[in-house]
Amino acid sequence: MLTSSVRRILFALCAATLPTAYAQAPAVAPYAVTGAAIVAPLGGLTGDALRGRAIVVDRQVGMCLLCHPGPFPEERFQGNLAPDLASIGRRLDAGQLRLRIVDSRRVNPETTMPAYHRIDGRMRVAPAWSGRPLLTAQQVEDVVALLATLRD
């Protein structure tokens, strides 16, 4: 379990790396949580795994590799604070992945992972991000599409 000081540092790192250009994201898409999943794709959108890969490895957009290691050998300095993404698609279905990206605290209230598609209840939000999600509905679906393919 991470200490509160480590969690504060992680939140600060995430907030500091968010570029202003991405602050123009639209409001959140409506969704329904069923059990431990968001079964329906956000906005009825279809994700693209190649775009999802670009989001996951981009340390200015998804920021996933700051904490998660994964099957991206060309990416240096992957994190080791969060679960390995290598076989995440075998462990979790698309709905479970979607909920963890949209609002990981619904699954684990103690997580340091930010809610990527929520605007309420967030802590230490930069003014440029107030009222805006970190990822659009399309970006969430793209990341889900990628993660669902990671089955090794």
Give the ranges of each region predicted by the language model.
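C-terminal capping alpha-helices of c-type cytochrome domains
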Residues: 116-152
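Short pre-active-site segment immediately N-terminal to redox-active cysteine/selenocysteine motifs
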Residues: 59-63, 71, 139
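Short sequence/structural segments immediately N-terminal
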Residues: 61, 108, 152
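Gly/Gly-Pro-rich "capping" loops immediately C-terminal to redox-active cysteine motifs
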Residues: 42-46, 55, 65, 69-106, ...
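Soluble non-cytosolic domains of exported or imported proteins
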Residues: 46, 50, 58, 91, ...
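Bacterial N-terminal signal peptides
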Residues: 8-20
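N-terminal secretory signal peptides that target proteins for export/translocation
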Residues: 1-5
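Electrostatic cytochrome c docking/interface patches
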Residues: 25-59
